[in-house]
């Protein structure tokens, strides 16, 4: 991205992207040793990450991040960078290959005072089609990433009594689009 801004002689965009990328990296490093961070902080990191990806792929997708008015994001904690890999998969494996502009929706909804439902939905090409487009090396890399997230959730659930539950589903009958639903408990 920075290379394309520089080659197009758009120094302002290159500087803005680098500044925001640096901010994201600093936050990731600050939080990397913590088991949990406030949900509010995770949302800020996610907003910054999605903004950077949209900056790179603005012709590929639009996005929205919606937070339920009743949800107090300061009352919940979440493992840092838990949501980002799911959003990354939506962009890189679903929306990026779509011919027309796609849609990414991220919603935070209070189910009850003790529970939040986080939904990440894209109308991309779907997991099956994405898998067909990958090289063998890409298949190994992706399964490692999602496998690591699943292991991390399992360990945290053992330590903290089933705090996080994740489901990944196709949203259309033709297997296009993906929805990740994550339930987070206090």
Task: Locate each region found by the language model.
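Short, proline-centered helix/strand-breaking motifs
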Residues: 79, 85, 180-186
């Amino acid at each position: 991205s920075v290379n394309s801004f520089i080659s197009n002689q758009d120094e302002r965009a290159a500087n803005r992207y680098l500044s925001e990328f640096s901010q994201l990296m600093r936050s990731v490093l600050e939080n990397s040793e913590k088991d949990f961070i406030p949900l509010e902080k995770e949302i800020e990191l996610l907003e910054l990450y999605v903004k950077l990806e949209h900056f790179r792929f603005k012709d590929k997708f639009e996005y929205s991040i919606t937070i339920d008015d009743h949800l107090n994001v300061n009352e919940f904690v979440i493992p840092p960078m838990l949501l980002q890999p799911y959003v990354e998969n939506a962009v890189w494996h679903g929306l990026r290959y779509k011919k027309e502009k796609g849609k990414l929706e991220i919603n935070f909804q209070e189910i009850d005072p003790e529970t939040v439902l986080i939904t990440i939905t894209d109308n991309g090409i779907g997991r099956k089609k994405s898998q067909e487009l990958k090289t063998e090396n890409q298949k190994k890399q992706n399964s490692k990433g999602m496998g690591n997230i699943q292991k991390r959730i399992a360990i945290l659930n053992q330590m903290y009594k089933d705090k996080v539950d994740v489901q990944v589903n196709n949203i259309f009958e033709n297997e296009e689009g993906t929805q990740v639903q994550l339930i987070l408990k206090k």
